Regions:
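Short, glycine/acidic-enriched capping/hinge loops at junctions between secondary-structure elements
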Residues: 4-7, 24-25, 45-47
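Start-of-domain marker
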Residues: 1-13
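Secondary-structure transition/turn motif
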Residues: 36-44
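Solvent-exposed adhesion/ligand-recognition segments of exported proteins
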Residues: 1, 16, 23-28
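Hydrophobic beta-strand residues in large extracellular and virion-surface proteins
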Residues: 12, 33-35, 61, 82
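N-terminal beta-strand/beta-hairpin edge segment
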Residues: 8, 16-20, 32, 39, ...
């Protein structure tokens, strides 16, 4: 699991079994932090790896495969892009101007906080639990068997296809459905 927090300084801490610590790699490429196991080594029989990262600003989150990300503190953002695919999961509290979410596969997201503009694109069997995410304006595209729950107070523009489901709380002005 990757735990992220917003702090004044940058830092990273890795907790794992002693036998895999030497094979855990961290690198920053093009401003992106990558955490992975050395691909040239086959490791069997280890328990979960936990990584804690602190940073002052976060702009992008990308969780794939069976990756798990949890916010250990609320984040204040101008614009945040979250991409979750495969069986990836994201649990985060955010406050800010704009949050864009793209979720596919069996991705699971649990978001809370306050956002002015929320752009949501979901497909396959992705799910969003966002009852505690208070959104002013929402633009949602949901397809496949994806399901989203969100609280909207201002304007809603939605395109739902296949067996997609959008459940919203509030009384938004619907401009497209």
């Amino acid at each position: 699991t990757l735990y992220i927090s917003q702090g004044k300084t940058e830092g990273i801490t890795v907790e794992a079994d002693d036998n895999i610590i030497p094979y855990i790699k961290t690198e920053i490429k093009n401003g992106q932090l990558n955490i992975f196991l050395d691909p040239e080594v086959i490791i069997r029989g280890y328990t979960a790896m936990n990584v804690s990262v602190s940073m002052p600003v976060i702009t992008d989150i990308n969780v794939a495969a069976a990756g798990r990300l949890e916010g250990s503190s609320p984040f204040t953002v101008n614009k945040l892009e979250i991409v979750a695919s495969g069986a990836g999961s994201v649990k985060l509290e955010v406050k800010g101007s704009e949050v864009d979410v793209e979720a596919s596969g069996a991705a699971r997201l649990e978001l809370k906080g306050e956002v002015e503009q929320f752009d949501l694109e979901m497909s396959s069997a992705a799910t969003l639990k966002g009852w505690e995410l208070r959104v002013k304006n929402c633009d949602a595209e949901i397809s496949g068997a994806a399901k989203a729950e969100v609280s909207i107070s201002g304007q809603l523009e939605a395109e739902i296809s296949s067996a997609g489901i959008l459940i919203y709380d509030g009384n938004p002005r619907i401009t497209k459905q």
